[in-house]
């Protein structure tokens, strides 16, 4: 079992790129492998909410959206930190243009959509670089998601949880399933971290 800190993970990603892959390919591998595992678990297409931050964690979610809609899923996407995305996340947002069954929604629309219910809620707001306290608006969003129905999935690490120390904001997203990539992070294996991660699945993405 491989376990990497956030800093070690960044080093491994850079090493993979130095050997000839690209950050775009790593994101594609992460999002596609998570989507494929999820659809094996839930072969019946339904409704999903994907909550994205503006960085590469959200980019993984946008890749998932592309693969899920191809299998008949109806996807709502919420950009929780605005629409000024990282270059890789923006690239994957643009790849969704023109695809059916994908809708971008606002925070104002979210509560009504949650009342209708989602089969799956995928959270990709903050990734392994998070530490400290959640911004007020993200804490409120996590509270809303935590009290909603549907299978809850975190990408890499639940937002609000420090992946190295397992320190958690009181409003940390509470996942039923966490997909992590290339290696486990220390928080996935700690008793306090497991409270928020629940089942953690480590997926290979082409990183040693």
Tell me the role of every PLM-derived stretch.
Residues 1-44, 208:
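Positively charged, low-complexity intrinsically disordered leader regions
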Residues 22, 106-109, 162:
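Short, solvent-exposed coil/turn linker segments
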């Amino acid at each position: 079992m491989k376990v990497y800190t956030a800093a070690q993970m960044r080093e491994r990603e850079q090493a993979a790129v130095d050997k000839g892959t690209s950050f775009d390919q790593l994101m594609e591998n992460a999002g596609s492998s998570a989507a494929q595992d999820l659809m094996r678990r839930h072969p019946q297409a339904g409704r999903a909410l994907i909550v994205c931050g503006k960085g590469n964690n959200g980019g993984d979610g946008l890749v998932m959206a592309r693969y899920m809609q191809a299998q008949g899923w109806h996807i709502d996407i919420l950009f929780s930190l605005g629409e000024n995305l990282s270059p890789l996340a923006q690239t994957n947002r643009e790849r969704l243009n023109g695809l059916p069954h994908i809708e971008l929604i606002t925070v104002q629309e979210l509560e009504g959509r949650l009342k209708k219910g989602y089969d799956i809620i995928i959270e990709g707001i903050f990734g392994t670089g998070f530490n400290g306290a959640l911004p007020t608006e993200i804490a409120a969003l996590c509270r809303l998601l935590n009290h909603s129905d549907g299978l809850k999935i975190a990408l890499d690490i639940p937002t609000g949880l420090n992946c190295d120390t397992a320190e958690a904001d009181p409003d940390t997203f509470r996942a039923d399933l966490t997909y992590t990539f290339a290696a486990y992070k220390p928080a996935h294996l700690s008793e306090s971290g497991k409270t928020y991660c629940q089942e953690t699945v480590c997926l290979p993405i082409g990183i040693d």
